[in-house]
Every structure is written in structure tokens, then in C-alpha cells.
Amino acid sequence: MIRLHDTMAREKRPFVPLNPQRITMYVCGPTVYGRAHIGNARPAVVFDTLARLIRHEFGEQSLIYARNVTDVDDKIIASAETEGVDPSVITERYERHYLEDMGALGVRPPDIAPHATQEIGAMTAMIEQLVASGNAYEAEGHVLFSVPSDADYGVLSKRDRDQMIAGARVEVAPYKRDPADFVLWKPSAEEVIGWDSPWGRGRPGWHVECSAMIARHLGETIDIHGGGLDLIFPHHENEIAQSRCAHGGLPLARFWVHNGFVDMGAEKMSKSLGNVITPAELLEQGHRGETLRLALLSAHYRQPLPWTENLVSQAKSTLDRLYRAAGEADPTAVDDGVIEALRDDLNTPLALSRLSALDGGALKASAHLLGLLGSSSADWFQGDTDAAAVEARIAERAEAKKNRDFAAADRIRDELKADGIVLEDGAGGTTWRRE
């Protein structure tokens, strides 16, 4: 049985879905105004791995996995104004980049990818419900959620009132009845993207987007809601409040699962801090997506992950070792030890250590569950390389050695090494692989 750490309960609990034939999981996806950094990739990889585990345990068709795209946001609007283009140019560009980058890391597309701009009707309908129930109010063209109207507010983050106000993203506006109240709808100037609504032309607040899309595509109560630790407050806390009030007190999610940060030095990797490195940059440097995926899985998902060159180098060495051990075997059965590790709150470090004890088909099948060893060993060691050209240089080197021109032989070896090709001399001749 799968056991997951539930942020709400502050403990690991057995995962028993509401309906094993229709398991629902929603993960907060990208706000598409810039290139994703490797910290943004961590939840994509973590929840992709959890989705693989759920499908292994309950059946390939058992899970409906939704990951949204926030394509209306103040940062998107600012980027569009800077470039002098329509916001859709920004969002389409960076969504395309996001999907390319995550695909390179072996992240499968979600079953549903709702876009905020395509769900405005669902959002305004939810806001109208909250106004009608007395949980929201209109003020100066805005609609705000009344935090004091929800007696259970704070159940996820366990923050006291002063912490809530300090942790909110915005300064206290004069039109708020209470400093903790948050925006459901905000007015848009004529030149800014917006939609007609009962409260005038405007656009949705960040939090109501996810609540409305979850209800529309997955239902009022889902099995798992995921995201990064930084989303616990205010985003997920606010989602819980508005969904509960709109749906007669029903819980939004039965499990809240949050991944830890990727750190650069002593700080969390963050665009606002400017200490980011992107998958695109790492791929351009010659690292393979599978290497980056293994690096992201090397620490338990709830723990911080310090990102270093050594981490990536170790991940590459581990994959070299695993590909050699797997050979060209076809996948067989997944190893029980790997399964048990993943069932225990997605313990990927333990699962990876178990992989090191396997070989052949069992290794291949078990690694697939982690999204690893998706290539053949030949492709891993020699793929994307002009094999004929390398073999020609090896033949040239062999001829030089035959003629006892060892300086020429060493030069060829060094030139290939500089191109990332490692030669290995053995009794059966010379073989090669990429570094």
C-alpha cells in the first residue's frame, strides 16, 4: 500500500483513493512568463514519478492527472508590455519551452492541462457563489474573499493571524474589510487583458483559478493536490478556503503533498533572487535530460536539494553504471524492493540504491518506474554521435599503433576525448562511449 506524507495531517497516511478506478491528482503548474529553472522542474519530475507509481499500483487508466497553466498574471502582462506584444505571444512561447524542457527530463504530459484564460466562466461562477453565500464582497471593482467568514481558515499552514497577513503577497489595500482578505477578481484597465463579468471588466485572482479548474475537471473533492512548499501559504490555504465555502464545506483534497526546494548555495533557487539555472542551459552544456531527472530524484522529495556540479556529475556516473548493468535486456518484473521504497512516501533515494543491486530486465523494469533507462545502452553511450566517423578515427589510431607511431595514436585518442568520446582498449579491440 502507498503511504504519503499529508501536509494537512503532518504525518504519513495510507493512500486509499475515493474511487480506485478514478483517482484524481492536481498539481499547480507553470506561470508562463519566463523559462523554467531547475527548481521549477522538481515538482514536475516528482509528481510525474508519483503518477507512474499510482498507475503501476492501480492500473494505467486509474489516474486522471491535471496540471494547470497560468497564462494570465501580472508578470505576463509586464513581459508583454516590455516586448510590445500581445500576452498570448509570451504565454505560448514559454509554455512551448516548458513542455520541451520537461519532456527532455522524461516528464509525461498530464492527462488534462487546463489554461486559466480558457476557464474564466468557471471562475466567475465560483466567485458569484461565494458572494451569494456571504464569503466574498465587492469593493472598488475588486471582489475579495472574506477570511473572517471562514472559521477554519489556516487549517493547512497552521499559521496564526499575524503570520498570515505578513505572508500574503500584497500590501494591505484600503478597500479590504480585513487585512487578510484576498482578491478573487481585479479590474483591468482598457489596454490590459480582461474579461467582462458581473463586477465589470477584469481578470481573476491567482487562487481562484486553481479552485475553479479543479472543480470543473476533477470534482469538488480530489484525492491528491500537489505543489512546492512555497505554495502552502497563501496559495493552497486560499484554495482550500474558497473551495470549501463554495462547496458546502467539502474538503478540496484528501492528501496535500508538497516538495522541498532546490537550493543554490545557501538560498532557495528563485527567479526573484536571480540565482537560477535552467534545464535549457544545462542541456545546452551537454548534460542529458535523464541525468537531470536522476539528480532531481536523488534526494527525498520533501527535503531540500542542493544543486551542484558534483550532483550532476554523480548522476551521470550512476546512469553509466546502470546502463552497463541493464545491457540490452528487455524489461521483466519490477523489483519488490524498489516498489516498497516508492510506496513509502516516494522514497526515491532508497529506490535508487536498490537499483544499484539489480541488473538486466529487472533493473530495466524497475528503472522505468522512476522514468529512467528509457534508452538502449547503445544509444546512451553512443547516441547522437557520428558512429562511422568515430570508427574511422579508431581504425586510423589502430593503424598508427601498428606502425608504432604512438604519438599519433595518443593524439587521436586525445582529440576524441576532447569531443567527449572515451576509448577503451580491450582484448577484443577498442570500444568507445560518450562521456
Predicted regions and their residues:
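Short, glycine/charge-rich beta-strand/loop segments that flank catalytic centers
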Residues: 69-72, 95-98, 108-123, 141-150
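The substrate-binding groove and active-site-proximal loops of carbohydrate-active enzymes
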Residues: 81-87, 112-117, 228
